[in-house]
């Protein structure tokens, strides 16, 4: 007993900050080798009982961890970790200390990026950066995520961000090679990149070997499966469909057309089209260095079988880089990358429709002589009769896509290579010159084949199409950098010049009439031939200068002049200036005697960027040779000249504040406004010109919003660590100018969005649904005049009509969300870790085009319909007077137009998604070191586990880009996203 008392001592003490001698709050104090611990109170004090001669471990974020012998009375001083304080953020052409940034930049490190196994960086960022909306338009393997930074500022030109990889614009990379990703969101940071940065910049820094480091090998492998998610999309089963059809037929006709034996057939066509798709990723990387050389090399394989049968992708990529000191004044960086990929698509768009539209009464397989199903898919032609037993084929689409998929295919193959040579010349310790030279080439081939043994109304004799594309690019960037410090004054500047040339070639050929199973073009009768050859060039010059005083006041100015061959000679040069300033308040003397705010910075920026992301040479009149005149090839005009085309221009303003409380809670708030002017639009012209439209600069759009981010280290003691982060971005989009101030429509597959001054760029324009008349079950629409105003009765109430053609369209919602964001958390204890990522979107409207045929009130009697019995929306069908129903009465061959384009099918697209959960274990160093390992991690990860949404389709996360065949927010037989389960292991030697 006395020995035990003698073995313990009571320890009291205070922990101080070495920089300002202030007590430190919340310092974690652990008895080394045990789980005993405590934290300091608000005055920096602690008290605990520990074994005599115990060693205390003190840790605090941003400070060096220290070990100290325990005594009864202790005064402990902790020093800041210079490496953390001087954390450098890569901006592509330059690097800036994080504390000294004057721009809106968010950096995410590899640890928070690689919890999602994906070949696409967009998925890695989803829900992790405020103001950045990442959308997966579907589940087709190989499709890239769509990224929007601070809204959409262009209608016809691309609004996607540009990637800068290791200082090279447009570089390629493998996600497993990523070290950090920085998202540049305002003109202060993006202005140096000019036109390419109109949609923002994503700066990727890849892993590299360090000079003087030992050789290490990293191995990573993940494997698992993916299942299709159908969300709230529920189709009728055999019984519900049978009873639904009973309401569409007269009793005598129903018995003849729909025999009771159909109730014995209940085929789930979706199960025939979809399966569990395998997904796997393997990566090996080697890095190391000698005194003057650092090297890194990796090889990666990614394979994914699509959940839709017959689809998938395979990709192999390699990366190698060398950093070498050639002389004291010269060093060199060399990097090469290659990617080889192959993608298989659904051989027909009809497959996604047929998976749900086919009647459950139709069996997809051939029946044998005994009436039993075989494993062979049945062939159906235009006669809509089964060849095996001559029963009717009830489905309206008189073909069997499962049979066709046995013979037909659509696929693409590509190979990309890039090389970078960079030389850094150090004239003095304050003056440096860098030249970066890049070369890249890419080859792609796409093939589409329809076998004559399958039924296709367009090509009963078979069809083959092949297209090939080749691209080559060369670029050089040359930058002179200098900087120095005189007392409290620091000055840095750089001046640079870029030049790039590129060439792209494309050829295509199609033919018909080949023999069965022969998919060679030379076995066909020529059907069409096409192609193009497009060269291009650009140059730019830029200047940037920055100044700070006392590490408290910072200002940066940038100017870039850029020329592009996309525009006519007199409009080729664009001028893009920008400026940014910040005040690091926490470095002021009056902030040194307080304990709560450990970092506080105000920042502001304003600048101009451009956009030239349109097809080349739109300013020229073009001719086509695809037409005949008197049976001879003739050149006919295909496009009007538009010689005054010029750059789209974006004026960007941003204000921000960065705060850190008690060195555990980081927070940022940003306000921004971006005015995009001189938008490139297709403007109507007089029919007498022989054309309907011409491309001109004729519009403006404004985006304004607020972004908020908070990251907190909630717990860091006793081997426990808990971090949590939340971010949200609110954006308002408004069209501020249209050609001649006249609104116009963007239309795809009969659905329209109106572009009008004062409205969102993606404003849905259609007739407004008013519900169902409870007295007779008729569909109702609100009465609207030609100007989009409601027609009111004498009492001032909205009036309705059951005549679809008696009313007009109006704006009924937008495809743009009000806000989006994410919540992410990481918990770890004693090697065990759990990472959880979520993302959310609110306030957008989705037009569910699929419902026009699958929720059609009798208009499509030979299509299966969406279930009302199993719907999660509480849908009901009108049956008798007095029913307050969501669906009108069903009528055979419905002519009420209840399924025509209207806001009936415009749905709330808001959702909250459990994006990813990763659970794993890091083996202790003491254990794995015996096997010469420096790291051994095992983990299990699951993606898309749950989604809360009211949307009746398969997934509310859909396309946010408008084009010739689609609109932002338009849902139409989309490839469903998948839920993925994978296991993985990472080992380092």
Question: Residue spans of the language-model regions?
Answer:
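Short, small/polar-rich motifs associated with maturation and membrane association
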Residues: 1-327, 331-333, 337-339, 418, ...
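Short, solvent-exposed loop/turn motifs
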Residues: 23, 35, 64-67, 169-170, ...
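Extracellular/periplasmic, surface-exposed regions of secreted and cell-surface proteins
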Residues: 160, 175, 256, 277-280, ...
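Conserved small-residue
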Residues: 218-266, 348, 696, 713-815, ...
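Extracytoplasmic gating/loop element in the C-terminal half of outer-membrane beta-barrel translocons
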Residues: 260, 270, 457, 564, ...
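Acidic/polar loop-and-plug regions of large Gram-negative outer-membrane beta-barrel proteins
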Residues: 262, 339, 344-416, 615
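Glycine-rich, aromatic-lined ligand/substrate-binding cores of catalytic
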Residues: 814-849
């Amino acid at each position: 007993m006395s020995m035990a008392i003698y073995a313990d001592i009571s320890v009291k003490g205070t922990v101080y900050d070495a920089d300002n001698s202030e007590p430190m709050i919340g310092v974690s104090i652990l008895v080394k080798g045990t789980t005993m611990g405590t934290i300091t109170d608000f005055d920096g004090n602690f008290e605990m009982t520990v074994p005599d001669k115990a060693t205390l471990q003190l840790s605090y974020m941003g400070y060096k961890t220290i070990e100290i012998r325990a005594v009864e009375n202790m005064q402990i001083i902790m020093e800041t970790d210079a490496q953390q304080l001087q954390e450098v953020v890569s901006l592509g052409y330059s690097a800036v200390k994080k504390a000294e940034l004057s721009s809106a930049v968010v950096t995410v490190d590899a640890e928070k990026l690689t919890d999602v196994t994906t070949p696409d960086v967009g998925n890695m960022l989803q829900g992790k950066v405020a103001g950045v909306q990442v959308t997966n338009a579907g589940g087709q393997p190989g499709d890239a995520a769509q990224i929007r930074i601070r809204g959409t500022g262009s209608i016809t030109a691309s609004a996607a961000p540009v990637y800068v990889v290791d200082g090279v614009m447009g570089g390629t990379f493998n996600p497993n090679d990523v070290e950090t990703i920085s998202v540049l969101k305002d003109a202060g940071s993006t202005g140096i990149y000019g036109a390419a940065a109109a949609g923002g910049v994503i700066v990727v820094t890849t892993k590299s070997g360090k000079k003087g480091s030992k050789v290490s090998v990293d191995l990573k492998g993940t494997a698992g499966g993916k299942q299709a998610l159908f969300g709230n999309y529920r189709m009728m089963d055999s019984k519900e469909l049978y009873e639904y059809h009973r309401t569409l037929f007269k009793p005598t006709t129903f018995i003849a057309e729909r025999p009771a034996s159909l109730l014995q057939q209940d085929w789930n066509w979706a199960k025939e089209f979809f399966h569990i798709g395998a997904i796997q990723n393997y990566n090996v990387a080697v890095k190391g260095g000698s005194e003057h050389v650092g090297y890194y090399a990796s090889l990666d394989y990614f394979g994914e079988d699509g959940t839709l049968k017959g689809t998938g992708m395979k990709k192999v990529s390699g990366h190698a880089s060398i950093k070498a000191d050639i002389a004291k004044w010269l060093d060199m960086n060399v990097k090469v990358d290659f990617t080889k990929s192959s993608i298989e698509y659904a051989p027909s768009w009809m497959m996604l429709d047929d998976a749900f539209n086919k009647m459950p009464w139709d069996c997809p397989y051939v029946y044998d002589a005994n009436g039993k199903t075989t494993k062979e898919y049945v062939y159906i032609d235009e006669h809509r009769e089964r060849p095996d037993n001559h029963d009717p084929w009830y489905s309206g689409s008189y073909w069997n896509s499962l049979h066709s998929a046995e013979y037909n295919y659509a696929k693409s193959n590509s190979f990309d290579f890039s090389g970078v040579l960079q030389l850094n010349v150090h004239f003095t310790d304050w003056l440096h010159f860098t030249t970066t030279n890049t070369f890249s080439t890419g080859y792609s081939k796409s093939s589409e084949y329809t076998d004559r043994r399958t039924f296709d109304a367009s090509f009963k004799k078979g069809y083959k199409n092949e297209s090939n594309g080749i691209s080559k690019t060369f670029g050089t960037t040359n930058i002179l950098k200098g900087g120095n410090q005189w007392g409290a004054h620091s000055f840095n500047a750089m001046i640079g010049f870029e030049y790039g040339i590129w060439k792209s070639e494309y050829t295509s050929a199609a033919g018909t009439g080949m023999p069965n199973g022969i998919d060679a073009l030379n076995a066909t009768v020529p059907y069409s031939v096409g192609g193009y050859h497009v060269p291009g060039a650009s140059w730019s010059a830029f200047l940037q200068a920055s100044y700070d005083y006392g590490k408290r006041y910072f200002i940066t100015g940038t100017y870039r002049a850029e020329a592009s061959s996309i525009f006519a000679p007199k409009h080729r040069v664009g001028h893009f200036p920008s400026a940014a300033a910040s005040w690091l308040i926490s470095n002021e003397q009056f902030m040194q005697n307080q304990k709560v705010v450990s970092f506080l910075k105000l920042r502001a920026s304003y600048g101009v960027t451009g956009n030239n992301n349109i097809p080349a040479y739109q300013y020229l009149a073009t001719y086509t040779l695809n037409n005949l005149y008197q049976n001879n090839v003739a050149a006919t005009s295909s496009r009007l000249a538009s010689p005054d085309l010029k750059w789209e221009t974006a004026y960007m303003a941003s204000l921000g504040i960065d705060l850190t409380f008690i060195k555990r809670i980081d927070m940022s708030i940003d306000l921004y406004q971006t005015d995009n002017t001189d938008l490139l639009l297709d403007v109507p012209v007089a029919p007498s010109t022989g054309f309907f439209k011409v491309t001109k600069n004729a519009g403006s759009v404004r985006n304004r919003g607020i972004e908020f981010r908070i990251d907190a280290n909630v717990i860091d003691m006793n081997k426990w660590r808990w971090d949590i982060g939340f971010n949200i971005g609110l954006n308002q989009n408004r069209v501020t100018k249209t050609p001649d101030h006249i609104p116009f429509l963007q239309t795809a597959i009969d659905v329209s969005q109106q572009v009008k001054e004062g409205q969102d760029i993606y404003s849905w324009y259609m007739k407004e649904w008013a519900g169902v008349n409870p007295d007779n079950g008729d569909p109702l629409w609100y009465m609207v005049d030609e100007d989009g105003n409601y027609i009111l009765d004498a009492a001032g109430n909205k009036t309705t009509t059951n005549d679809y053609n008696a009313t007009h369209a109006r704006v009924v919602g937008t495809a743009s969300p009000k806000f989006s964001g994410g919540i992410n958390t990481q918990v770890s204890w004693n090697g065990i870790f759990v990472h959880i990522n979520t993302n959310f979107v609110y306030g957008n409207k989705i037009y569910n085009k699929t419902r026009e045929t699958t929720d059609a009130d009798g208009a499509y009697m030979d299509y299966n319909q969406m279930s009302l019995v199993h719907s999660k929306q509480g849908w009901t069908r009108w049956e008798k007077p007095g029913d307050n129903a969501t669906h009108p009465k069903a009528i055979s061959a419905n002519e009420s137009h209840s399924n025509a384009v209207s806001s009936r099918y415009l749905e709330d697209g808001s959702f909250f998604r459990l994006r990813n959960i990763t659970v794993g274990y890091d083996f202790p160093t003491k254990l794995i070191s015996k096997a010469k390992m420096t790291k051994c991690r095992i983990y299990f990860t699951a993606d898309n586990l749950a989604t809360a949404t009211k949307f009746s389709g398969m997934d509310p996360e859909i396309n946010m880009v408008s084009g010739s065949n689609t609109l932002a927010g338009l849902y139409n037989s989309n490839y469903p996203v998948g839920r993925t389960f994978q296991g993985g292991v990472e080992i380092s030697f």
